[in-house]
Amino acid sequence: TICLLLFPLTVVPLDGDQPAHQPAVRKHNIKSAVQLRQWDEEQQCCTGQCHICWPCC
């Protein structure tokens, strides 16, 4: 408990690769796929070139 008083958790830098950051990347990929007309809104997956977006149908 003394460690928490000396070193609060707010001073510890968080890792940038947290799962909370991944949806933003995924949304960017979906947006690109929608522009290329490869995103299936009904099935919520990518049809066509799967290296452009994920998940792939």
Curated annotation (Swiss-Prot):
Residues 1-16 form the signal peptide. The keyword Signal applies. One of its GO terms (molecular function) is toxin activity. Keywords: Disulfide bond, Secreted, Signal, Toxin. Its main location: secreted. Residues 17-44 form a propeptide. It comes from the Eukaryota. Expressed by the venom duct. Disulfide bonds join 45-57, 46-53, 50-56. It is found in: Secreted. It holds the Pfam family Conotoxin. One of its GO terms (cellular component) is extracellular region. Belongs to the conotoxin M superfamily. The cysteine framework is III (CC-C-C-CC). This is Conotoxin reg3.17. It comes from Conus regius.
